[in-house]
């Protein structure tokens, strides 16, 4: 996936020259509070089936960038961990090795870049499950996207099990920002997402209102259907 369609990782490349002071991994507690099963996915981290009320914890090394956590819905996997999901599928694998297929609500992060973490919720790949992304030990902001987006999704963005971002459907620079920094701005369709989830990225260059920082060494909690 083009990095301009997701998280602004050019910032992380710039900071990568600095010494990484934090040496312990960050813990991410992933909790399913939905009334239905969610197949949690993490890159890096793999994947896990979470029935309602279940949780899963992963550790992510300092210095990790371009990382994300998301939920998959309506999945079927065989005993070897091969199968498919209606939303968020990652190459038909229970244990994800890459990113998921849109639409999927994303918790994105880069750790210790430098001495602070960059975090966001992104709808640049669309929306499938309500989400909260928060620190477990304080010190920074709780991010939430809990509006009934699937039910209110514009007709041209509706898809089975979720709501597509306009870039996924229309594929022009106006929505995808493929011509580089400053090449696009908010649109009526991106505003649909922003009005309902003001904390979240609604289009690829939505950085000023959507990218947040936490102190390095923070641990996190991602909740589906908070």
From Swiss-Prot:
InterPro entries: Osmotin/thaumatin-like_sf, Thaumatin, Thaumatin_CS. Disulfide bonds join 34-225, 75-85, 90-96, 140-214, 145-197, 153-163, 167-176, 177-184. Residues 1-25 form the signal peptide. SMART domains: THN (SM00205). Pfam families: Thaumatin (PF00314). One of its GO terms (biological process) is defense response. The keyword Repressor does not apply. GO terms for cellular component: vacuole. Keywords: Disulfide bond, Pathogenesis-related protein, Plant defense, Signal, Vacuole. It is found in: Vacuole. Its main location: other. PR proteins are acid-soluble, protease-resistant proteins which accumulate in the intercellular spaces of many plants as a result of the hypersensitive reaction to a pathogen. Belongs to the thaumatin family. This is Pathogenesis-related protein R major form. It comes from Nicotiana tabacum. The lineage of its organism: Eukaryota, Viridiplantae, Streptophyta, Embryophyta, Tracheophyta.
């Amino acid at each position: 996936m083009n990095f301009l369609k997701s998280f602004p990782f050019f910032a992380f490349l710039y900071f990568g020259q600095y010494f990484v002071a934090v040496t312990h991994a960050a813990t991410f507690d992933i909790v399913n509070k939905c009334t239905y099963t969610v197949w949690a996915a993490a890159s890096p981290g793999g994947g896990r089936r979470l029935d309602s009320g279940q949780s899963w914890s992963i550790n992510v090394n300092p210095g990790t960038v371009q990382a994300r956590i998301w939920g998959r819905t309506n999945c079927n996997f065989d005993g070897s961990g091969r199968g498919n999901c209606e939303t968020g599928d990652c190459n038909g694998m229970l244990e994800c090795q890459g990113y998921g297929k849109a639409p999927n609500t994303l918790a994105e992060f880069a750790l210790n870049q430098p001495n602070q973490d960059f975090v966001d919720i992104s709808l640049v790949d669309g929306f499938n499950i309500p989400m909260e992304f928060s620190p477990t030990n304080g010190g920074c902001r709780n991010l939430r996207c809990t509006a009934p987006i699937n039910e209110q999704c514009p007709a041209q963005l509706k898809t089975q099990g979720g709501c597509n971002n306009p870039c996924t459907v229309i594929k022009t620079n106006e929505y995808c920002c493929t011509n580089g920094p400053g090449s696009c701005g908010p649109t009526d369709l991106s505003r649909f997402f922003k009005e309902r989830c003001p904390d979240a990225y609604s289009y690829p260059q939505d950085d000023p209102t959507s990218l947040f920082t936490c102190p390095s060494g923070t641990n996190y909690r991602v909740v589906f259907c908070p």
